[in-house]
Amino acid sequence: NLLNTRYIIVSPEALPLQNRFALGNAWFVERATLVENADAELLAIKTIDPATEAVVDRRFADQLTVVEQPGSETDTIYLTSYRPNLLTYEARLSADRIAVFSEIYYPYGWNAFIDDKPAGHFRTDYVLRGMVVPEGTHTITFRFEPRSYKTGNRISLAGSSILLIMLLYAALSALKTRRKNV
C-alpha cells in the first residue's frame, strides 16, 4: 500500500487483483510520530495507519516543522510528471502539511524543490520520502543530480578539451611542415 502497488498478480492464468488500499503516488498525513532509530521506526510502522500517520526517525526532526495537522478535504497532491530522474507534483493546501511520497528515500543525489527553491526532505516510514509542504499552491520537484555525475561530466569535458587542443596542434604542425616542404 505504501509503495502504491495497484495490482497483485497471483498467477499468470488469473486476472490481476486490484489493490483498493494503495495510497497513491503521494498523500498527506495528519501526524508524524518521532522514534529513536531505524529499528524503532520498523516496529512503529506495524502500529499505525499509514494513510493518516507517518513514522520518522528522530535524526530528521529538524526538518519536521509540523508534527500534527488535521486534514482538510480540499488539500490535494498529484504526480503530474514522472521521469526516472525528475518527479513533479502539484499540491494545494489549506495549512502546512506533511506529505509522504511513494518513492524510496535515497539522499545521495536526490534534491527536493518547492516552487524551484531548494527544500528539505526526509525519510519516513523507514523507506519513503517525506516533506513538509507549506500552505498554498505549489509545484514540488524531486531531481536526481548526483555529484559523481557532475564531476564525471567536468572530467570528460576537460579531457575532451585537452584532446581537441592536441589534435588542433598536431594538425597545425602538420600544415606548417607541409608548407615548408612545398
What are the language-model segments listed below?
Residues 1-36, 66-73:
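A cross-kingdom signal targeting lumenal/periplasmic-facing segments of multi-pass membrane
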Residues 32-51, 169:
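Short, cationic low-complexity segments
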Residues 6, 52-182:
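Active-site-proximal, structured, solvent-exposed surfaces of multi-pass membrane proteins
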